[in-house]
Amino acid sequence: NSNNINLSYDDQQRLIYSGTEQKYPTSNQLKSYPNGLLNPFNGTNFMHPTIQSNSLITRHPNNNSFQLNTTNDSNNNNTTNNGNDSRSHLYDISTFNAQNPYSLTNTLNFNSRTMNNQLTMNDSMKLNGNLTLHDTNYHALLNGSTSFGSTVFRSLVNSENQSYLNSSTNMLMNSSLDNINNSNDHSTLNDNNNDCIGQSLRQSGNSSESNVVVYPWMNPKGTDISVDQKRTRQTYTRYQTLELEKEFHFNKYLTRRRRIEIAHTLTLTERQIKIWFQNR
């Protein structure tokens, strides 16, 4: 302990932790995990199962980038180059596929026919230079296994059938115009028929009104009085109004005997006296 006093702080820390250096792994060493557990230090555990294949993703030896391999020769060259790299397991997923039950076994197969169809997509999707087909199943119908659907679909695309398409559209337009004309004619006929029916009904109504006998009991009560004979609003003279106001000042409610006396004095009917007091 006395010797450690003369040492610097860094030397003392180095002596204290000199025996524990082997307890912790270095940064370039990864722990091994049993089957079925994810390795958090390996990025391939979080990759989608569809891209975890030996023949799909490898590390380029020069620029540390990933590329696609389609042949077995490229896989062999890649394994030899990765042997020189101490951290090849961070880029190559060949060791992970041995434990991963979801590894992809099928390799990518590039079909020349599919590539040619993709290159000529714009030309094949044009119908006679004017009409463009936007259906996503267009190429699937052309390259499908069913012969009936492909032949029918190809026949519609060929330029020799343009006359058929034009004739069909013309027929549709002509039929629609004929339908419009027929509907107009039908509407005019209906209008004329309605006018004729209305005139005949009016004529029959006039004739029936002149021939029908109306008895007194058929009319409602009071309809026998003409417009001139209807009761008009009663206008009271100043003298009548004055006498009625004096009577109302003394008696707000009249008896029938007093009402008859006032009506005889003011030359009014008993009903008129009653209505005036009710309104007052």
Swiss-Prot record:
PROSITE patterns the record matches: HOMEOBOX_2 (PS50071)
Origin: domain of life: Eukaryota
Protein name listed in UniProt: Homeobox protein SMOX-1
Composition bias, Low complexity: 69-85
Organism encoding this protein: Schistosoma mansoni (Blood fluke)
Keyword DNA-binding found: yes
One cellular component (GO) term of this entry: nucleus
Protein family per UniProt: Belongs to the Antp homeobox family.
InterPro entries: Antp_homeobox (IPR050296), HD (IPR001356), HD_metazoa (IPR020479), Homeobox_antennapedia (IPR017995), Homeodomain-like_sf (IPR009057)
Residues in the DNA-binding region annotation: 229-280
GO molecular function, one term: RNA polymerase II cis-regulatory region sequence-specific DNA binding
Keyword Transmembrane helix included in the entry's annotation: no
A Pfam family the protein falls into: Homeodomain
